[in-house]
């Protein structure tokens, strides 16, 4: 059972790190696109838009947090994911569906699927106790397979969210 806990601990951290690394890369490569998305949410005052770089910096800090985490210090990643879910939900409740989420990658309109995706990612980022055992042999293989399946599942959900409004 301890091996399964280790598999979950490391693969969930790896998946959330991958999501944040992709988001940071997109925001830093295309800052104007990200700023446009921030403006679209109508949650940040104009003066706050000058500090757009704080979000990618916090996401990078969340990656580092997950990388060196003993499990109890995953609060930044969890908080950012819940913040993003709340920002999307607020705009959906306002009736605003025709805007880019600013998540990274190709343009993805906001929708309830993105809210659920971020909540699931937040659940994966929940602080937990680090496993004590060392991953060996089968445990490492299971972790890699779980991480790859999680990454594939994330990519599928992301594509479904991106396509949901286009139809």
Give the ranges of each region predicted by the language model.
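Membrane-interfacial helix-loop segments of redox and metal-homeostasis proteins
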Residues: 1-166
